[in-house]
Amino acid sequence: MAAKDVLFANDARQKMLKGVNLLADAVKVTLGPKGRNVVLDKSYGAPSITKDGVSVAKAIELKDKFENMGAQMVKQVASKANDEAGDGTTTATVLAQALINEGLKAVAAGMNPMDLKRGIDKAVDSAVEKLRAMAQPCSDKESITQVGSISANSDRAIGDIIAEAMEKVGRNGVITVEEGQGLSNELSVVEGMQFDRGYLSPYFITNQDSGAVELDNPYILLVDKKVSSIRELLPVLESVAKASRSLLIIAEDIDGEALATLVVNNLRGIVRAAAVKAPGFGDNRKAMLEDIAVLTAGTVISEEIGLELEKATIEQLGSAKKVTITKDTTTIVGGAAQESAIRDRVATIEKQIENTTSSYDKEKLQQRIAKLSGGVAVIKIGAATEVEMKEKKDRVDDALHATRAAVEEGIVAGGGVALTKIASELADLKGDNDDQNVGIRVALRAMEEPLRQIAINAGDEGSVVANAVKAGDAHYGYNAATGEYGNMIEMGILDPAKVTRSALQYAASVAGLMITTEAMITDHVADTSSEI
């Protein structure tokens, strides 16, 4: 077993604190509308320029292993806040730094670390309750625009395009961010259900100009297996031919004589048909087929439930107003489903989202809801250079997560004002003993730190701004972009309550662990400098 280095008590805490401050000092310069940029070196290609706190945090790895342990723990704060709310990473880091610095001073002065932690937790729990009570619903387009703009570092164009996307696809809709080709941002909305599977043969193409298959008012056959024999398909093909309508077949795969016969029928004009592979893999494929069945009022022909393809009837086929198939995608518009059937299916998937802990599964389930709800928006980012493109894409991603968080839990006054006001309201909060009271004071002082840092980054004196804001009414705050004071809600400076809440909770969690740390152990690094 490798030799270990061990540090105890104050020696351990000082090393850890040095790492915390190194990382936090690099991250906090990005906070607020006048936050500075950080340039990150890459092992290949051009360096990237960012104002995204979590990107800066992830880039930092320290040489000293004890210092690095402190830095990595604060990095965890930024990552956790980013995972839950998608934004607020810099705020979380600033809060954690303030809590750890003040907390360790109190420990050095002889306070009981466990009581300090209990005091911090008590203050944070009370602050979260007040934050939830303070939150206002965010549902109108202007509020969403303002939240998006603030999160994207006061870029109104980004706020506008996100609000427009949300208006078009709804709160359950999927909004994806891609790199565009031009200089300006573009928004495109895909109506209906789209999935990433194209036609199985170019002979199905009906529109030679666009190179797409376009089927009007088609029947849709859904099969949960591979189809190779034409014998299985004949009854359905004959029924569709009699009805003089086109047919889309979605199956695990179609090949051999089945595919060849469909192509021949197409070329001769007997039955206008097209075939695509079912989207997804494994259990996800079955779920997606069921979604398409609900959307088109059809039935999945599956031997698992005793349905055979040879005995399929025309009543088991789904239908839609239009289907467009390119070489890469299939889009179903105007499925024949009743609204109530889609609502029930969406409700079922929402329950699955509540019960799953995997962020990957949640994302996939959310995409299924969006496809059923008929909303997928794509924001294409325009920029002059690749470096600018990466920086802008990071900001749009942050803004998108912030607006989702705002719609979910509401909005509060931005610019660090909400936490500063809450700290003032909790000034009389008391713990069970004097050490807990110190912990409460540490937490309340730390809650002012984001506002102070925003003011410092804007070139103002943090303490002066904090005192002025505390003296004002509920929404009175400081607009760092203009240097003016006023009503933050009216000025459109808003923060999602979820972002502020998660930043505070994760910062307090890690700070509590660090304050109560008494020993640090790491692998011993042999000194090779004297070796020849």
Curated annotation (Swiss-Prot):
Segments traversing the membrane: none
Assigned keywords, A-Z: ATP-binding, Chaperone, Cytoplasm, Isomerase, Nucleotide-binding
The name this protein goes by in its record: Chaperonin GroEL 2
Enzyme type, top EC level: isomerase
Recorded catalytic activity of this chain's protein: ATP + H2O + a folded polypeptide = ADP + phosphate + an unfolded polypeptide
Biological processes per GO annotation: protein refolding
Gene from which the chain derives: groEL2
Subunit structure: Forms a cylinder of 14 subunits composed of two heptameric rings stacked back-to-back. Interacts with the co-chaperonin GroES.
NCBIfam families: GroEL (TIGR02348), PRK00013.1 (NF000592), PRK12849.1 (NF009487), PRK12850.1 (NF009488), PRK12851.1 (NF009489)
Gene3D superfamilies to which the protein is assigned, alphabetical: GroEL (3.50.7.10), GroEL-like equatorial domain (1.10.560.10), TCP-1-like chaperonin intermediate domain (3.30.260.10)
An example molecular function term from Gene Ontology annotations: ATP-dependent protein folding chaperone
Binding site for ATP: 30-33, 51, 87-91, 415, 479-481, 495
GO (cellular component) term, any one: cytoplasm
Family statement: Belongs to the chaperonin (HSP60) family.
Pfam families: Cpn60_TCP1
Its job: Together with its co-chaperonin GroES, plays an essential role in assisting protein folding. The GroEL-GroES system forms a nano-cage that allows encapsulation of the non-native substrate proteins and provides a physical environment optimized to promote and accelerate protein folding.
